[in-house]
Every structure is written in structure tokens, then in C-alpha cells.
Amino acid sequence: MKHKLYCFDFDGTLTTKDSMIELIRYAHGTKGLILGLLANIWYLVMMKLHLYPNWRSKERILAHFFGGMPAEAFDVLCNNFAALHHTDIRPQAIAEINDIIAQGGKVIVVSASAENWVAPMLAKAFNSMPTLSGTHLEVKDGKITGKIEGHNCYGEEKVNRIKEYMQANDIERAEYYIYAYGDSQGDKQMMEYADESFYKPFRQ
């Protein structure tokens, strides 16, 4: 019998809102969020037109709002945010993942958002913490730079993270039956890699 692996996108799939946007709103208020996005509007428009890389736009936004912030203070901010906003995770998703884990299924959340705030949100929401593979943020001289360390966990990188998970567990792809859950273009490759996929689930 094959091992079952359940791979979930985070923002929009498990959550009702974009967690990075909500973190910025939490830290800077709605006015600060809007002003910061307007200051970077050119790059956001270029990204939507596929003329500017998604990961570079993310770096600009993160650097604008959090660049230079002490990493410890940023993690405190993320934990406080998670304490309030773990309820942004869809109840249907919580119930299904809790059930999968209780039955011995393996769950990995593969997220383009940073682990700094996704991890505490998952820890607050679920009975048992799922495996998380998200984007990592660069820290230099003890401060958040706004740059991504390694690769943005988006598109093909999500497949790479799933492969890394399998390699770490010393199990071949052929031994897994993979389920993928996503809601956007960034999940396309992951959903194609899976044996079975679900687009925009948990919305009933």
C-alpha cells in the first residue's frame, strides 16, 4: 500500500485572507498598508503583467514594511499576529487536516508566505502541528533585510519542497500517493505533480 501525502497551499487555500497583507495591516494599520502598497504600485502592476518576478515584488514589500526590524522583535510580532489571526484558517480545513493527522496521514503545508508567521498560525489552529515548508527570510546582523533566503516557495519550488520531504523520509515518489490542495497559479505545478488535486477546496 502506498503512503499518503497531503500537500496544502496556505494563503487562500487554508485561509480566507492573504496572511502577509494581514500581517502588514496588523503591524502598520490599514492606512500604512495602503500607503506602502501605493509606494510600490509600479512593481506590483509589473508583477501582475508578468514583467517583474513575483519574488522580487515580495522582497520589495517586505523590505518596505519590515526591513531593518530586529529579527527577535519581528518574531514576537508574528506570534502576536498569529494569536489573533489563526482564526483566518478555514474551519473546514482545520477539521479535515486534524482528521487526516489523527488517522496517521502525512500533511505538509507548502507556503509562499514566510514561516515566521505561518508556523505560529498553524500551531494555534491544529491539534497536531503539520509539517511546514515555507519561504525563509534573510536575517543580517540580527535584523530582517526583506530579502528571501534561498528560493520563494512558489510554483516549481513547491514541487522541490515536496521532493525534499520525500528524500528526507527516504521514500521514493512511486511509494507515495499525493493529494494537493491549491487555489492559484503558484500551486499549478504542485497540483500537476500530485496524483489527485483539489482546486479551491473548503469553501462550502
Predicted features by range, described:
Residues T16-S19, S57-K58, P70, K158:
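Alpha-helical structural motif
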Residues I21-R25, A39, E59-A63, F74-N79, ...:
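Generic detector of well-ordered alpha-helical segments enriched in charged/polar residues
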Residues L23-L33, M47-R60, D88-I101:
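Short, charge-rich amphipathic segments
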Residues G29-T30, M47, L51, G67-G68, ...:
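A structural signal for alpha-helix termini and helix-coil/disorder junctions
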Residues V45-A71, L132, H136-L137:
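Short, compositionally biased "basic patch" segments
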Residues S57-Q92:
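Metal-dependent phosphoesterase signature
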